[in-house]
A protein has these predicted regions:
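FIC/Doc superfamily catalytic core
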Residues: 1-276
């Protein structure tokens, strides 16, 4: 069984690229409060735009789509879903709203993660919503020949509850003791979450929602105004390439999370630059 211990991150020697990203984001966070006070009317408009973009982008990454007109109506609660895709889009909108409004009261714990997953798939009739996976879920790609190639084998279903519990415990412990900068800790958590792949469906969307939740809880609220999900969707190839590099030898606990950390820091940094 793979173990999780984020205290090790404190011992890493980070290169100048990582340190530069972290410093820039800290500077942006320092100016954040000033912008929030100076531009209330403009920020309200940005929030509504970001909600639509985040809902559309995070679902589009997974091939879940609808028309722009329908999307806007769904996000603004002016219509009901017509099909499975729209059910999942509406579920994402609801969880996104919940995180925006209540992030301070949603602990990063297995029970709450399960509740968010249940709410994500609330409008579907899927029996596994709100439950960890019950069958193995390989991450595959289809070759031009039509042959399926296994990219990554996540943990088995029987390992999943304990792994998510351990993941949450080490995250909370290291965060509480202030051993590691949250900007480094959060991408490590998300990488491990994706490698566990704890659900039958919805892992990618849950990872992006949890990213927002943890960023907001640590004072990085740019995602409320500039869509982080849109930034990821626009750099999807880089996203998957960073994941593929960072999950090598993950089962042996010899993987290097740096490529994924750099990718996520670049995304957060670009969102702050757009915000300013």
């Amino acid at each position: 069984m793979r173990t999780f211990d984020y205290k090790k991150i404190a011992e890493y020697s980070w290169d100048n690229e990582v340190l530069s990203y972290v410093a820039k984001i800290h500077e942006c966070k320092g100016r954040q409060e000033l912008y929030l006070k100076q531009r209330p009317a403009e920020l309200e408009r940005l929030v509504e735009i970001a909600k639509i973009q985040s809902t559309e982008s995070s679902n589009r990454i997974e091939g879940i789509i609808t028309t722009n007109a329908r999307l806007k109506q769904l996000v603004e609660d002016k219509t009901t879903p017509r099909n499975r895709d729209e059910m999942e889009i509406l579920g994402y909108r609801n969880v996104l709203n919940l995180i925006h409004e209540n992030y301070a009261y949603i602990p990063v714990e297995p029970g709450y993660i399960l509740q968010l997953h249940r709410d994500l798939l609330k409008y579907t009739n899927l029996t596994y919503r709100g439950h960890f996976k019950t069958t193995p879920n390989e991450i595959n790609m289809t070759l031009p020949s039509g042959e399926r190639h296994v990219l990554f084998r996540p943990l088995e279903p029987y390992e999943t509850p304990g792994a998510v519990e351990a993941l949450c415990c080490t995250y909370q412990d290291v965060l509480h003791r202030e051993l590691v900068d949250p900007l480094l800790l959060i991408p490590c958590f998300i990488l491990d979450f994706l490698c566990i792949h704890p659900f039958n469906d919805g892992n990618g969307r849950m990872s992006r929602l949890l990213t927002l939740l943890m960023l907001y809880q640590n004072g990085y609220v740019v995602g409320q105004y500039i869509s982080i999900e849109k930034a990821i969707a626009e750099t999807k190839d880089e996203y998957y390439a960073a994941l593929a590099q960072a999950d090598q030898h993950w089962h042996e606990e010899e993987n290097d999370p740096t490529p994924f950390i750099k990718y996520m820091l670049a995304v957060i940094c670009s969102c702050y630059q757009d915000f300013e």
